[in-house]
């Protein structure tokens, strides 16, 4: 994801050897799902589900975990979801843009798919708060077994680790990022080694690979069969990261890392924990740490903490990356994006997101105090995002790839059925703590839809009093104003209408520049726009030009740099001859039909606090003039 991914991948990604790419992918992509053994079986047998720690219960749960990993990750994500890349980019926003394109002119379907994408993105932010909290808490809880009386110190220690993690984000993790891969490879080797040790105690645990144990479990526990999926799904947390980080590593390195190292290590560890439980049911209080020899407990706690910090770093960086994509697709107000590396464009930091996540994580740790309590909140965010991803991929498979329905529909129905069951199993958890990601998701969904709709209404209101460009130019020919030297660039959302800033400037100053450029920035539903397709230029005469700049949702919108590509003899964009005119709209909530008054007030607040065009488009501060306009909505 974003920052962490590029730290591990580096600029030499395309030339890296397969083993190097595999190690890098393990360090970034698999941190979240790789730390799931810390708490999954612990939650299953201590989460109040009523599962007995006996032979049939243990084998039934292991069968559910094993076949969930096979179906959801090995089949659904590896074979289908990872193929749905948007010019190599993955993630819920990239997939939303791809699905929106697949829907074509079907407006209702487009709207439905966008809503699904925004729901998935909103839940991802909830996941971005829960993952660091539950991961670090579960790692530090190992100290309870190593030292008596340390229970009261678990929360403070976890908070210190988490706060330190958020504090270093602004400075980047370029140097330590190179250690992510080796540390996580070590982690998975330790997982596998501990698992082998446990399996040797009770080799019969391997029979849980037979799916009939899962069937027997449902038959023996008809009342809790579906509910237990709410705990089993914890083994799948982080599956979405496989898709989100595809743009940095590609599908093949991610798949190789999964099948060669990650899947075997996870299966061995889960089965090793299960084997230990067959011999010692009391170990269910913390099966991961009790699987290790007593002499290895402290080193294992240290390694677990490092692994959970790396997993948390990947999620935080993913939130930064997702936010940048959402900003450029028009779903989130512009924020200040800081680059933490001069070498890697993808290493970014967004302060508003970082501090919001930190506050959310601190509240979660203080409110829930243990990984077991947090587990109830975790599943809702994970399964909700997975379900939205499946819906979006379904649209891409049927409408964009044109897969024959006779082949695609059975696969998609199975995927939707499994995801739906996992999501349904987590719905009852909403009243047990799962309300947090749901409420966070609702708030973020309202913010994103309000911003998108508000911007649309704002453009419509500005257009109501707009003057068509041809009429304006004709009037200039009849009554030419005084012209001054230089180039004036007016940013406008509508390239065929006269910007309000231009009208205000002419009205108050009674002059026009020699060259007047009406500049429109358009964001496409693709990650990157080639330099050859970056701009369109039209000359209207009388020194007027229309320029349209095209950017992808991962491109860096550097307007002065992009304008240098406009090779037109009549245009001069030299820095000391170019002035940029911006319009700053102030929205006033009114009774005009559009949005509810409270949403209009919310949009006005968001617009007031959004980052302006000056910083976002990297305009030179000393060459910008900003003019204000009041708009009633």
Curated annotation (Swiss-Prot):
Keywords: Cell inner membrane, Cell membrane, Ion transport, Membrane, Potassium, Potassium transport, Symport, Transmembrane, Transmembrane helix, Transport. It comes from the Bacteria. It is a multi-pass membrane protein. Transport of potassium into the cell. Likely operates as a K(+):H(+) symporter. One of its GO terms (cellular component) is plasma membrane. It catalyses: K(+)(in) + H(+)(in) = K(+)(out) + H(+)(out). InterPro entries: K+_transporter, K_trans_C, K_trans_N, Kup. This is Probable potassium transport system protein Kup. GO terms for molecular function: potassium ion transmembrane transporter activity; symporter activity. Pfam families: K_trans, K_trans_C. The gene is kup. Belongs to the HAK/KUP transporter (TC 2.A.72) family. It is found in: Cell inner membrane. The chain crosses the membrane at residues 19-39, 61-81, 112-132, 149-169, 179-199, 224-244, 258-278, 290-310, 348-368, 377-397, 398-418, 430-450.
């Amino acid at each position: 994801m974003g920052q962490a991914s590029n730290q591990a991948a580096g600029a030499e990604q395309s030339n890296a050897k397969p083993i190097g790419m595999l190690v890098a992918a393990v360090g970034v992509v698999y941190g979240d799902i790789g730390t799931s053994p810390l708490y999954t079986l612990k939650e299953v047998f201590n989460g109040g589900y009523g599962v007995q720690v006996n032979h049939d219960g243990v084998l039934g749960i292991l069968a559910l975990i094993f076949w969930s990993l096979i179906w959801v990750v090995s089949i659904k994500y590896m074979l289908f979801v990872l193929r749905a890349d948007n010019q190599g980019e993955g993630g819920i926003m990239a997939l939303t843009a791809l699905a929106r394109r697949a829907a074509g002119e079907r407006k209702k379907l487009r709207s439905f798919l966008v809503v699904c994408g925004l729901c998935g993105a909103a839940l991802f932010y909830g996941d971005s708060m829960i993952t660091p909290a539950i991961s670090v808490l579960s790692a530090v809880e190992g100290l309870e077994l190593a030292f008596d009386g340390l229970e009261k110190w678990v929360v403070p220690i976890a908070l210190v680790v988490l706060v330190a993690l958020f504090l270093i984000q602004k400075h980047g993790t370029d140097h330590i990022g190179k250690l992510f891969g080796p540390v996580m490879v070590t982690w998975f080797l330790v997982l596998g080694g501990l698992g082998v040790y446990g399996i040797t105690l009770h080799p019969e645990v391997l029979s849980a690979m037979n799916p009939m144990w899962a069937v027997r479990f449902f038959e023996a526990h008809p009342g809790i069969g579906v509910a237990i999926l709410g705990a089993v799904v914890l083994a799948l947390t982080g599956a979405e990261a496989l898709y989100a980080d595809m743009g940095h590593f590609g599908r093949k390195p991610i798949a190789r890392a999964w099948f060669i190292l990650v899947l075997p290590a996870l299966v061995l560890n889960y089965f090793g924990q299960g084997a230990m439980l067959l011999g010692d049911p009391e170990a269910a209080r913390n099966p991961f740490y009790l699987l290790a020899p007593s002499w290895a407990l402290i080193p294992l706690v240290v390694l677990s903490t490092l692994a959970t910090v790396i997993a948390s770093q990947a999620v935080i960086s993913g939130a930064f990356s997702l936010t940048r994509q959402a900003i450029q697709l028009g779903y989130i107000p512009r924020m200040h994006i800081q680059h933490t590396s001069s070498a890697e464009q993808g290493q970014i930091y967004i302060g508003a997101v970082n501090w919001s996540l930190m506050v959310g994580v601190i509240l979660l740790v203080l409110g829930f105090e243990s990984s077991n309590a947090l587990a109830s909140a975790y599943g809702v965010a994970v399964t909700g995002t997975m379900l939205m991803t499946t819906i979006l991929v379904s649209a891409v498979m049927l409408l964009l790839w044109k897969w024959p329905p006779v082949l695609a529909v059975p696969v998609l129905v199975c995927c939707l059925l499994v995801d739906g069951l996992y999501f349904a199993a987590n719905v009852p958890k909403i009243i047990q703590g799962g309300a947090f990601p749901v409420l966070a998701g609702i708030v973020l969904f309202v913010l994103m839809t309000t911003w998108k709709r508000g911007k649309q209404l704002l453009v419509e209101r500005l257009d109501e009093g707009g003057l068509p460009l041809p009429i304006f130019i004709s009037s200039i020919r009849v009554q030419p104003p005084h012209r001054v030297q230089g180039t004036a660039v007016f940013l406008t959302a509508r390239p065929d209408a006269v910007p309000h800033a231009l009208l205000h400037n002419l009205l108050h100053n009674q002059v026009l520049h020699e060259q007047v450029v009406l500049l429109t920035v358009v964001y496409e539903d693709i990650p990157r726009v080639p330099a050859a397709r970056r701009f369109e230029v039209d000359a209207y005469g009388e020194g007027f030009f229309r320029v349209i700049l095209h950017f992808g949702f991962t491109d860096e919108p550097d307007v002065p740099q992009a304008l240098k590509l406009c090779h037109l003899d009549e245009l001069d964009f030299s820095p000391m001859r170019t002035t940029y005119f911006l319009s700053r709209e102030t929205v006033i909530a009114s009774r005009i039909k559009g949005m509810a008054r409270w949403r209009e007030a919310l949009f006005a607040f968001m617009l007031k606090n959004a980052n302006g065009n000056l910083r976002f488009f990297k305009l030179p501060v000393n060459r910008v003039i900003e003019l204000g306009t009041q708009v009633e909505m």
